Amino acid sequence: MNLEDLMSLIKTSRKHKYIYHFTDADNLKSMETFGILSKEQQPQKLVFPRFTGGDSASRTSDKFRGIYNDVSLCLTRNHQMAFRCRKDGRHPNQIYLGISSDVLKFPGVRVALGLANAHTTKILPIEQAIPNIDIELLYTWVEDAPNFFPRMSALEKLRFSFQFAYRAK
């Protein structure tokens, strides 16, 4: 499967027609003005979110892994980090924003094959990452598939990274 095939599959899927960005509803006003900013871009635009997704340790890890200036998107509306943000109270009014799969064509798109700031997670250009994504499980109804829950858990850790400010329309 190539990038165009993946984008087409996302757009026509009955399960996930978008890729997603999770945040707290309190952050929508700045996103309407500036788009979805990376952690590095936020202070440059004088944007200081009241409810952030990462804690100080994750921000340090993001810098170490070279993803601090990336915008994070995910493939499902059930990302493990979103769950942690709700549980820890970092996103009391959490929402998922549906983002067009067209952003996958932007230069610099990478995929973290796991939690992006974990030291052992591979981060690959999207074209190289596609063969590692469980497309069948993501975009078809296969809840009775072998090893459904471990496979789904792995998918819920994937993260797309972008080095630009994406403004949702």
Model-derived regions, located:
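Active-site-proximal loop/hinge segments that shape catalytic or ion-binding/gating pockets
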Residues: 1-72, 79-169
